[in-house]
Regions:
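Export/targeting segments at the very N-terminus of extracytoplasmic proteins
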Residues: 54, 224-273, 306, 323
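Extracytoplasmic small-molecule ligand-binding "clamshell" domains
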Residues: 58-153
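Extended ligand-binding regions for polar small-molecule ligands
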Residues: 58-74, 109-121, 181-222, 243, ...
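Periplasmic-binding protein-like
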Residues: 93-95, 162-201, 230, 369-372, ...
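A ligand-binding cleft/hinge motif common to bilobed small-molecule-binding domains
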Residues: 150-165, 347-348, 352-357
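Short, functionally critical alpha-helical segments immediately adjacent to catalytic or ligand/cofactor-binding
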Residues: 258-274, 309-313, 335-340, 390
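Substrate-binding/active-site groove segments that recognize
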Residues: 276-300, 307-318, 361-367, 390
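Catalytic and substrate-binding regions of cell-wall glycan-acting enzymes that process beta-1,4-linked
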Residues: 335-401
Length: 402
């Protein structure tokens, strides 16, 4: 039975020194099957792309595998080799507040973002498949239907099925519990000694990635609506105020190609759905438009709820177009951040990320920049809460409607 991967360093502690790469690769070359040679050569290439520890561990396992199959059967290819050959990482996932959220075209989540990051690190496409429960998802790994799983299954369940797990907190459970996330969230692999699992362990437990994981957890904070006051206040607004404006939200969401509940979440974050709201900075109405933005959107009366909702919807659509090069699902977070602090502020962050050699179209990178510079820029703090809160309100409404 495979043992769970708990910590990267602990996992390698018991390994003995394997044969040299040249010896291991010479075993591959001796096969007479041409098609199998090609597969094994691709495995060898994949080995060379791994960190030194992962490479030696992988070779150690291959050199000592007496039952290694030199036919074209499924056992002839490691999970890592299959992923690289397909250029796609297929993941079985169970919906949850710590794994992924997928309703009405919105697909995001703490585990989802980390899994997407791992796929990007491999240079492949992520193919996420939704399963009803942990056992079904783990069975998909067990029977080779998927490459790995994203669940909050217990270690006992994973061990009993002969699988290996990698905790996404990399042993730092307090990081997740602080933000209301389940510390059991993990990746599960069929074989802990496979290069796919070893590469994942190296990726998620890298010192820089551990810090990034904490920032992603901060964005997916689940504590907002677990607070009784916040939950009751939000529910009351949906019950008592929303019916007065629901048709306007729906009409203008259709007009400008939005999800209407996203507009409601924005309206609640902006004004608690108060049509007469006025802030000390001069923004007004349900969607809290500035005077200049209102004029640009054709709004003559900012406290008129219909005009305000239409103006907010129109402005959000313009912002989505402004960040058209940002792929979904990140584009909506970019647009919301721009709605809060202006598109030029977001583009300035993108420019800085480019200078740092980072992906400027990644929301995780933008959010990390906001978090890293929050102490020196109060607008960044406000923006972080703004986008994260809207995400929470949106998820709550979607879950209620399911």
């Amino acid at each position: 039975m495979a043992k769970p991967i708990t910590r990267f360093t602990r996992y390698f502690a018991h390994l003995t020194r394997p044969p040299t790469p040249s010896l291991a690769m010479s075993r591959f070359i001796k096969t007479k099957n041409i098609k199998t040679k090609k597969i094994l050569q691709m495995v060898a290439i994949a080995m060379l792309s791994l960190p030194a520890k992962s490479l030696t561990t992988f070779e150690h396992g291959m050199a000592n595998n007496a039952t290694f199959n030199t036919t074209l059967g499924s056992d002839a290819k490691t999970a890592h080799a299959k992923v690289m050959m397909r250029q796609a990482l297929t993941v079985a996932a169970v919906h949850g507040d710590s794994t992924f959220f997928s309703i009405d075209g919105f697909e995001h989540g703490f585990g989802y973002d980390l899994t997407r990051g791992y796929a990007n690190d491999l240079g492949v496409t992520l193919n996420l498949l939704s399963y009803d429960d942990e056992q079904d998802a783990l069975n998909a790994v067990r029977f080779g239907d998927v490459d790995m799983a994203l669940t909050v299954a217990s270690s006992r369940m994973i061990n009993d099925m002969g699988l290996s797990e990698l905790n996404l907190s990399c042993g730092r459970d307090a990081t997740l519990t602080r933000y209301g996330l389940n510390p059991k969230v993990s990746w599960t692999f069929k074989e802990g000694s496979d290069a796919l699992a070893l590469h994942a362990s190296h990726y998620i437990c890298d010192d820089v990635q551990v810090l990034d994981t904490a920032k992603i957890a901060h964005f997916y904070n689940q504590n907002l609506l677990k607070d009784d006051y916040n939950q009751q206040h939000f529910a009351k607004a949906l019950t008592e105020k929303l019916p007065n404006y629901k048709s306007s939200f729906q009409t203008h969401a259709d007009e400008y190609n939005h999800d209407w509940e996203l507009l409601v979440a924005m309206g609640y974050q902006e004004s608690h759905l108060n049509a007469n709201a006025i802030s000390p900075t001069g923004v007004e109405g349900i969607m809290m438009l500035t005077n200049s933005t209102a004029k640009q959107m054709g709004v003559s009366n900012r406290v008129d709820p219909v005009q305000s909702i239409r103006g907010g919807a129109k402005y959000l659509e313009l912002l989505k177009a402004e960040f058209a090069d940002v792929p979904a699902p990140d584009r909506i977070w970019f647009a919301l951040a721009a709605y809060n602090m202006g598109p030029y502020a977001v583009k300035d962050i993108q420019a800085k990320l480019i200078q740092e050699g980072k992906d400027a179209n990644s929301w995780s990178n933008v959010y990390a920049h906001l978090a890293d510079n929050a102490q020196s820029n109060g607008r960044y703090v406000q923006c972080m809460h703004y986008v994260s809160n809207i995400r929470s309100y949106l998820e709550e409404m979607k879950l209620q409607s399911v």
